[in-house]
Structure formats: C-alpha cells, structure tokens
Amino acid sequence: MYILVWKEGQQIRTFQDLEECGQFQTASNITDGQIFSINVTPTMSKGGETGETQLRRLMYLSASTEPEKCYAEYLADMAHVATLRNKQIGVSGFLLYSSPFFFEVIEGTDEELDFLFAKISADPRHVRCIVLANGPCTGRLYGEWHMKDSHIDNITKHPAIKTILFQIARSFSCMWSYLPKNAANMLLLGKNPNKQAPEPMSVVVTFIYLVEFSSILAHPGQTEQCADILAAFVDACVRNVEGTGAQVAKFITGICIAYWPINRAEDALIGLQQLSEDLAELRSQQRPGSALSLIYSRCGVHYGRALLCNAGFRKADFTLLGDCINTASRITSLSVKLKVPLLLSFEVRCVLGDEMREVLETSGLHKVKGRDQPVQVYQFNARELDSAMVRAKIEQLNPGSYRALCPVKPYESLLPAQRPPIFDDTPRENQPKLSQVQRRDSLVDRLSLIAKLAFPTSMMAGGEGQLITLTYISQAAHPMTRLDLASIQRIAFARNESSNITGSLLHVSGLFVQTLEGPKGAVVSLYLKIRQDKRHKDVVADFMAPSEGREYGSPLDMTSATEEMLTSFPPLQELLTHLAKPFISLETYVPTTVVRYLTAGNNPRNLQPVSVEVVLLATDICSFTPLSEKCSLTEVWTICKTIFVAFIRAIFNEGGEVIKLIGDCVTAYFPPTGADKAVHACQEIVTFCAQLGDAFHDVLDCRSVVACGVGLDFGQVIMAQCGSLGMTEFVVAGEVSARVMEVVALTREAGRAIVITEPLPDRLAPKLRDTGIIPCQEGVDGVPCYGNLGPEWELDVATIKKNIYGFHDARALAAMKKVDVGTNAPGRGAPAGGIPSSPKVRPPGRTNSVSSYTPDPNEALDPPMAESVFLDMCHQRGDTANNSIAVKLRQAANDDRLDLGRMLQGPHELMPVMQAIKHLTNLRMLNMSDNFVVDNNVGELVESCIPMRSLQVLDLSNNPGLTKVIALKRLIKHNTQVREFLLNGTRIAPTEQRKLQSSMNVNRLCASTDLKGSHKYEH
C-alpha cells in the first residue's frame, strides 16, 4: 500500500499501487506531497478466506415491497441465500426486519461492499435504500451473518421497541429526501450538521431560472399545472446538475442554485447546456394544452470564493455566502437583457480549458446592480432566448381539456381533514409568556424558550379529552447512571399516574425515546414540561396522532439498553442509535409543513398541492454587497448567523413560517388573517438591527453597521412538493413571491424600513392602519405601497453606506496603526515582510500613484520571505492558503522566473500574491496570465514589480479585464530593464500596445547613459 501525504500532513490518501498514486498527485497538482510505502498485515480473519487490508461498515434502511410475505419461512429462505453468498465473498453483518422496514449492516473491504451494495440496491424486494452510516472500521462486530431469528418478533416482545423502531424508521425514511445534500452527507459521517463550522471554498456558482415562471403563475388558466411544471424543472435540474459533479444548494421560486468545485468548471457548462436540451426535448413531447411546453431555462455562471455554512434557529439551512453569489445572480439577470440562455463571467473563462475557450464569444462589459465596476461576460453561439417570446406563448396557451398530473386545488375547497398543515395552529395559551425585560430587549437570548408544538389538523377538533399518542426523541445532557434512571422512573411514574397517562421510556446510548398515551390536554401539558427538563436537550417530536386505544398498561415502562432484551441482540442497540441520533437534526432542515404532516402519521408524498392566499414577508441586509466584498468570509457568516437567529425567532414568535434562507435574505409567510402579526414581526426585525448597531457601537465589529429592509405583500401562492424520491422540495411559489422582493428593494427608495402593499392595510387593526402607516410616493407594478410611520422606522441608505465605508476605513486605519506600533517598538524590526494589514492603506509618504512611489526604508525585502508573507496574508484574511502558490513562491526565491499562470483560484488571492512577489527582487520573468488582473488592481501589481530591478518580461495575457496601459508605462519608467509585456487576450487596443513597446525601446536607450544604481531600490 502507498500513502500520499500533503499539506504538511493535513491531507492523507491511500493507494494500492504506485502508478495510481502518481496519477492522482499529478492530476491534483500536488507539489508538496510525499509518498510512503507500507506493508499491512491483516488483523481480521473472520468473514472471508481472502486477506483483507482495510474494512468498512455500511448500514442502510429500506422498505419492503411485499411486507405481507415477510413471515418466518420467507426470511429463512432469504437468510440461507444471504449466508452462502456473503460467506463466499467475505462479508459479515446482520439483517433485521421490522415491518415494513429492513435494517442491514454489512462489513467488508471497499471492493466487496461496493459490489454487494450495488446488487442490494437493485433488489426488487425492497425500495428506498437510505444509507445511515458508511465509514471505515477497525474490526468486525459480527463474525458471522446474523440472519437467523432476525424478525423483530423473535428478538423482543416489548411493544416499546417495536413501536419506536417503526416510528423512527418511518419518519427517517420520509424526511431523508427533503434534506440538503450537505446535511445528509454529514449525517452519514456521524456528525451533527447543526454543529458544523463554516467551510470556505472556491466554487463555480450558477443560478438557473425558469423563464417567465411568474407569468405562468399569474395566468389564471395555468395555475392548475404549476405543480407539474415545478416537478419537471426540479427533476431536470437535479439530473443534470448532480450528474456533472455539482450539488444543488437550494430551490427558490422557479430558481435553482447549484455549485461545482473549481476543477469541474467545464462539466458545469456541459451540464447546463444539456439541461437546456433536455427541456427542449420535453417541450417537443407535450400534448396540446400542456404548460410543460413552456419550460425554458436561463443560466448565469460565476466563479469565486464562497462560504458554505449552516445558519438558522429552529429552521436552519445550508447556504452559500459571498460576493460571488450575488454576482452570479446579477449575471443571470443580465442574460435576460442579452437574450442568451447561458452567460458566464470572465472569472469562469479563466478556469476553462483552451478548447472550450475557443468556442466562447465575448458579450462585452456590462454594469450590474451592486457592483461599482462593470462585469466582463461571455456566451456560447446558441439560439437566442427572448423572454417576450416566451411570455407571448404563455398568454396564447389554451389548456382546453388537458388535465394536470398533480392538479393544484384551492385550499379552502378542501375538507379540514384533507388540508395540508401549512399554518401554525399552535394554541397560544400553551406558549410561555415573556417577561417585561425580555419584551423590552430583543437582544436577550431566548434559546431557552419552548419550541411551539405544532398540532396536526386532524387533532384540532378532538377536544382536550381525545386519546392521543406522542413519541419524542432527545439527548441526555450528561451521562446517565442507574441511580439517575431510577430517579426518573420513580418521579415520572407518580406524575403520569396522577394525569391518567401511560407509556414507555427507552434509554439507549445517551438517547431518550419516550411514548406518552392519554388525554390530549394532559399529554400536551406534560410534553411542554418535559421539554424544559435540564437533564436532556434537542427534544424533537417524532409522532403525534389520535389513538384508538392504549398500548401500555403502566404509567411508565422504563427500559434500558443494557437489559437482557438488547444484550441478546447487540445490533439492535447500534441500530436505534444510528436512527435516533440523526433524527434530532432532521426536523431543523425539513419544511415545517412536511414535519407536521409526518408527525400526524401521514405519508408526506400524499400532500395535496394547494393554492392559498398568504401574507408574504421578505427581508435582507441593506447594502450587503459593499459590506461583504471588503469583509472576510468568516465575518460575512458571523453577520448572517446573527441576523438569521433573530429574524427566524421573530417570525416564529408571531406565528409565521420560514420558507427559505437565501444568502442574506429570509422569506416567510403568514396566514391571511395574520397581517398584524406580520407587521409586528417586521418591527421586531428592524428593532433588532438597530439594537445590534448600538451594542457594537464602540467596537470595530462588522455587525455594527447592519441595517435591513422588510417588505410585506399579500397574494396567492402555490404550495406543492416537487421532485423525485432522490431529492424532494416543498415549494412555495406565486407571482407575489417575485413581487415581494421588489417591495424589499422599494424600502431603499422610499426611505422606510418596512413597506407593505395595497391589499394589506385593509387587513390591519384599525389603530395600526389609521396611525401607523403613511403612503409611499413609489409603488410596485402599479400597486400602491405604504411605509411604517415613525422615526425609528426610517431607512437612510446614504447614511448606511457612509457607515459601511467608514467602518472599513476605520478598521484599515486601526490595522495600519497596529503595524506601525509593531515597527517602531524598541528592539523590534519591521513586521514580516512589512505587510500592511489593509492593502488599501498606505504608510505616510506613499500614494497610489506609481510615478511618485518611493521605497519605504523600514520595508525589508528578502526573497525567502515571499512564501511566509503569502501565508500570513491569507491567514489574516481568514482564507485557506493555496499550497501550489506557496510552493511556487518558495522555488522562485532561488530562481529568476516565477510562473503563476492560471494558478490563482480567485481574485481574493491576488492581494496576498502581490504582497509576496514584492520580495522576489531577483526575478527576471513573471507570468501572471489568466489570473484575474484588471484595471482596478494592475496598479498594485505594478507597484509589487518595481523592486524587481532585473525584471525583463511580464506576462499579463488572457486577462480581458485589462483595458489601460498607464500603470504599465509607470513600470517602464522605474524599471529600465523591462523589454516585453505579453498582452494577448487583453482588451488593450493594438495601437496602445505599440506605443507601449516604443516607450520600452526609448527607455532602454535613455537608460544606457544613466549612472549605475539609479533604480529606486538601490541605496
């Protein structure tokens, strides 16, 4: 076996042969790797006759397709075949059946498990194979194949085990397809997604728009088919995006956000082109009247640094943060104007291969919202996609007799028992009241509040005496001893007996799984008290539904996992642990409507698509682009994490439902009768931001300049679940979904932090309607708008931007002072490489003009320092250093050439690189081609090149953001040895390039008569 170690031991990978190891090292551009050869002696002999060098354990859950046949004889035949097969290939494990679910664990080598699981997945006797755990193991737990007596009835007669196993497995199986891929992957690794730290990464991001979907939603004749359109769109996106190595970040109303790693940029474009072709084929196959004939996609692609992070409270989501996400959205919007189906930025072009670059066509420089500088974009030679043409087709389509596969029905037309639980009907009398201090201070930590219990619609009419069953899962706050468990049983027994409640409590590996039976009022009251018990945490309701009779005769049947029942079959304990522990995280990421429907004992796949009127809320951070583009990714995450917790809490406290977390934006909806509560939630959100600024007023913290705008609109939306079993989305979509985002944008123009549209004032309480709002001069789509009255609800965008720029300047100045203090301290020299903490701040006597540049006497330039300067700068910015660049800088310290062509992973690496190469005074040739050099930063690159007294060649080719030569002329003036600039692939005019060459020729002639030592850096 061969082991490849790189990144100073932080990354390790094993290979079976040396050739495979070398190919991986070359393909991954690993220059600092070391290869070790080792011999591994197998330590496990059970389970196979062949020697095994590494073991893996895989656990999965599936549902039987024929549960009525799963009797003892059926399972015995299955056991006989499985035992012979697995003994032959060297696999051990166990199989447990608890109707209608199979639970299986298999152990073996990678090759054996991959082969076996591929066959298992294709077996028609079960469906929905969900991997619960898959990772390396140090030894086998099961020396032989445990199939004998593996039916749950032969293992235990205890009703608690059978009931709990069924309920958890059912919920887990249903929720899995709704999980974000990142959360699912972390659960497979045994990690809690809620506890994961943010991960910076270089990604190719795309926004895929369903063209003119808002027009389809607004067309009264096509509302019934909207669920079909969304389902087809989701399936097509998942198939082409995940099929090319990407991950779907999220679906919004007719929009898919996805991202690829940097080395899959070409695959990204191929997948997006294939998506367009698949939709074209789908359109051609439709019958007359089908709205599926109107599906077109439009994509914008951008490349940059982003932060994958987990944010939220009660309702969380994995989201991508960063300036590149906003830019990708703007590029997609720009494609509407340019009438192209696929538009990509210059940064994406930089990471493509030469063959794909040749087929690209430039679309010029364009100004986009939120960016000071124009964006260079490119396109393929494809057929024009005009939104006006699609809109005309939508208006002309006549459904006729065509009937949708998943028809959308009005919410009010359904019987109460048939309505999906889309609104929070929690009885407010069960919710704890806030103290006066808590009501006054919205910054107070309210994490200790009880999460509201969502009641299924089927239970609302049963009365307090209705018999119900409730099962919950929680984690022990500390290890439980036998004395602790005995105390819990003694107290709970007496309490349950007095309330006419029966049930069971199972303790397994630090987890509690309890079932309560009894009158609804008593069970709910007890459950709310149990949630506040400090001996456990992460309490999640798994099942709550009416019951026809009691299953348990005792007030509390306490069962410990250490008792004979689990000891007789050890796999059962492991299975319960792998099911219950991840389930605690599931509820946070799955849509609330799905959780409610599932908790009531229903199958979420049967949710009826409905159209319903709602109050829609959207809020985002004002001037987030200028705030985020000068903050580190970690700071951006800190901002969003802080506001998401407060925003979501305010929405839930007023009875709203969170739809999505989108970058810095949160969307939510309230019932049509909840206009007042929606306004109160808006006020709490705005108040929180104001108090946040006050809390950090005297501290240089990025949260001190946060302000937000909130928009409220009223209209009809469609709620439906879309997608295959592989990935399912619960979508809230409507014309109002797009309009409410325009209402949020209107808050800036109107100067009001809260803006509501015309339908809402009539739904407000008289006092708030008559004295709390004023008309706005502007409107949205001809609809009048109103803003909240009062100085505390004013929104001054100019002041907000001034505060943001002032914050950046103050922090840069503070960092510069810190460097100066370190430089001038007695007995101390200059900081490493003389790195300024903020590249935008110059020491006294220096300006942005290269022509007036003079060397800093305290700046010690040393070629061996280049690598450490680069690493230090990356660390200061909170970024992960590019090890390939670090190795190149280390090698260049002893050479006169530095080739960084196409080495940078994004513009964020330019500043550390430019600070580092300043130390390479020995260079004669510098290659910075394809490295995001534009007019805005070429001046600083030139400044870094001035100390290179012998520099002769500077390669800036394939940087189309370059249009001016003035900075290069200044370099010629200071460095008389420069004889060539390579500018192919830039946008510098040929005439300017010829003038530049003439300047170099003249400069060299003049320099031949100069005295030696005339260079700026010769002392």
UniProtKB/Swiss-Prot annotation:
GO CC terms: motile cilium
Repeat among the record's keywords?
Answer: yes
Q: Where is this region: Disordered?
A: 825-862
Q: Where in the cell is it found?
A: Cell projection, Cilium, Flagellum
Q: Where is the composition biased (Low complexity)?
A: 825-839
Q: Which keywords are on file for this protein?
A: Cell projection, Cilium, Flagellum, Repeat
Matching PROSITE patterns, A to Z?
BLUF, GUANYLATE_CYCLASE_2
Check the record and name the InterPro entries matching this protein. Answer: A/G_cyclase (IPR001054), Acylphosphatase-like_dom_sf (IPR036046), Adenylyl/Guanylyl_Cyclase_3/4 (IPR050697), BLUF_domain (IPR007024), LRR_dom_sf (IPR032675), Nucleotide_cyclase (IPR029787)
Please list the residue ranges annotated as the BLUF domain. 55-148, 467-559
Regions of biased composition (Polar residues) lie at 846-855
GO molecular function terms here?
blue light photoreceptor activity; FAD binding
- Record bears the keyword Glycoprotein: no
Q: What else is known?
A: The FB strain is deficient in phototaxis. It is not known if this is due to defective adenylate cyclase activity or defective BLUF domains in this protein. In wild-type E.gracilis, photoactivated adenylate cyclase is found in the paraxonemal bodies (PABs). PABs are not visible in all cells in this strain, and are smaller than in wild-type.
Family assignment from sequence similarity: Belongs to the adenylyl cyclase class-4/guanylyl cyclase family.
Name of the protein: Photoactivated adenylate cyclase subunit alpha-like protein FB
* Organism (species): Euglena gracilis
